[in-house]
Amino acid sequence: MYQTYSILQKLWLFIKLFTPMCITQFSLVGGTFIAIFLTGQYSTIDLAGVATGYNLWLLFYIFAQGTLMGITPIIAQLLGAKKTDSIPTIVYQGFYIATTLALIILLIGVFGLVPLLNFLNLEPAATAVCINYLKAFALGLFPLLWVNTLRNTVDSHGLTHYSMAIVVTSFVVNVFLNYSLIFGHFGLPEIGGVGAGYGIAGACWTNFILFSAMVLFHPKLKRYRIYKDWVRPKWQYIREQLQIGLPIGSSIFFEASIFSIAGLLMVHFGSAVVAAHQSVIAFTNVFYCLPLSIAMASTIAVGYEVGAERHKEAIQYSYISRVLAIVIAILICAFTFTHMESISALFTNDEEVYNLIYRFLGYGVFFSAFDAIGTPLQGILRGYKDVKIVFYISLISYWGVCFPISYILANNPNYGPFGVWIGLLASVIVAGILFTIRTWYIQHKQVHIKA
């Protein structure tokens, strides 16, 4: 990051931040997309098992990932204020938090997975796939969370193009392992949907090794001597990250949990509905990379300017991100509505699943459009370290609005599984309105204080 003096310079810098982040997010989500696509081609039962397992681990990972995002605005504001001496200590505390979160997730899986699957009453064959898929995924759990600390540190320094290159490399590894292990190619065993778990684990270790090399050898990062001058846990730094990260993690958890809960509600309608629903979720997740990347770039750009006490410039970056988000929302709608048949056929050869995907897409496109407008606002607020209100808005919108509507309508014969999507759509509309109000308030408050 560096100071800019005109709107065009800010736009160019924002695009330079956003573009590599977008490609990075596409690669991260692309691994899941490919896994769902290939597993769907293998069998509907395997897809149902992998989809259920994915919904379960995603629920916990999203919370952990969001919590670890607390490091980003801290480092961005320190760089803006040119106070970098404490950055190495902050990175080490991020490692300690990541390790603790990984241990908690692992213990929950060991003791809670089988009882939960029994409660869901998933088909026995799909249950077996789900359990083995999650066991394979667990091999990459620790590096998956360690990488979040490393990547957030790299991105905070504006080195997003390096993150892009690393994650694209791991994406290639993921695709290769998925294809080889699901179908049994290149001398590897054919293990169906379980291969998707090994694919993720392999990608996680690839990411960790490459990001570790990055912080060891890049000129802007090697001065921090990560892995060389180890720092013990320091509560004041851990507390600062958790004070910012826990509200972020909780707010993202509330949003992500509605997808997992929605997926689990779909289990009661059979494997075909689960497969169709997860296919549409995989498709919407691909488009979610765009607003999410805008949000992440906004956190860095806004946080940098706030750290330098240039509040008007921070507002200009927020306007750039919001206009870009609206343009993306329009493009998402236009593309999806003109390609619904092709998109539906992409995921399955089963006629029943195809028809369900086609109908779910009508809801999914509007969900993606409204989410594209609301998500960047969260990134702007994180740049101001205004994270507690994001927590409350997410709680109200996703659990206070989505969950009851989805549950009630899903149990209504007139709506069934489509009621779940109505609840999802209602939640992002409410969240977008509330985030818009809060962003306007906090920005005008900052300008008033400076004046």
What role is predicted for each listed range?
Residues 23, 27, 31, 60-64, ...:
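Residue-level hotspots within pore-lining transmembrane alpha-helices
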Residues 68, 137-155, 163-174, 196-212, ...:
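Short runs within selected transmembrane alpha-helices of multi-pass transporters and secretion channels
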Residues 1-22, 75-142, 188-246, 302-367, ...:
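Short alpha-helical transmembrane segments in multi-pass integral membrane proteins
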Residues 12-72, 76, 246-268:
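Signature of the first transmembrane helix
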Residues 21, 25, 33-37, 54, ...:
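Transmembrane alpha-helix boundary and packing residues in multipass membrane permease domains
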Residues 30-48, 117-124, 180-191, 253-286, ...:
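Helix-terminus/linker motif at the lipid-water interface of multi-pass membrane proteins
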Residues 36, 47-110, 144-163, 263, ...:
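Small-residue-rich hydrophobic transmembrane alpha-helices
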Residues 36, 109, 178, 182, ...:
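Structural signal for membrane-spanning alpha-helices in multi-pass inner-membrane proteins
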